[in-house]
Amino acid sequence: MYAVGARVIACEPQELFARYLRATLPRDITVVHAAVGKEETTASMAVSSSHPTVSSLKPDFVVGASSAPGFGHVKWDTRESVTVTTLDRLIETHGVPSYVKIDVEGFELDVLGGLSQAIELISVEFLPGFPDLTLQVIDRLMDFGPYQFNPVMGETARFLWPQWRDGPAARAWLESLPSDSSSGDLFARLRHDS
């Protein structure tokens, strides 16, 4: 997004990574040292010393992930106290975004719990081993308005479907995925009837 001229606001709750991002990213990318959730607070984040990019604020996710495809090697062996903000607070501070990417290891619904308005384009990471997490996200987004969905599998950077699909179709597709399928990002765009 930055490469095409978008203003980027990135949230990073872990102190070490927030410092790294501030030191290495272009200065006009704003790095907010906070997690995003349903309310402003502090929280205890489960951190993997070996794989710190899969840290999570969702206790159920950490417990269930140990047996999920792709996570068997991850051990959450430490905790970090982190500041939590909300999407609404970020919007109040930085303005309404055109796009929000949510990749928070099982905490997606909590992030959307701190949002009170529809956003034009949102993507969330989906993990076939945890379909209920993404099904709840689809339902939450549909509460905001008529979203259409399209997945990107793995790191392909290509939409899976030639046509965007409604919430029930996206749910049916997600429910049909084998639990050992590749993860990816589920994009949701607000439909505007012409």
What residues fall within each predicted segment?
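Phosphate/nucleotide-binding beta-alpha loop and adjacent structural elements of enzyme active sites
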Residues: 1-194
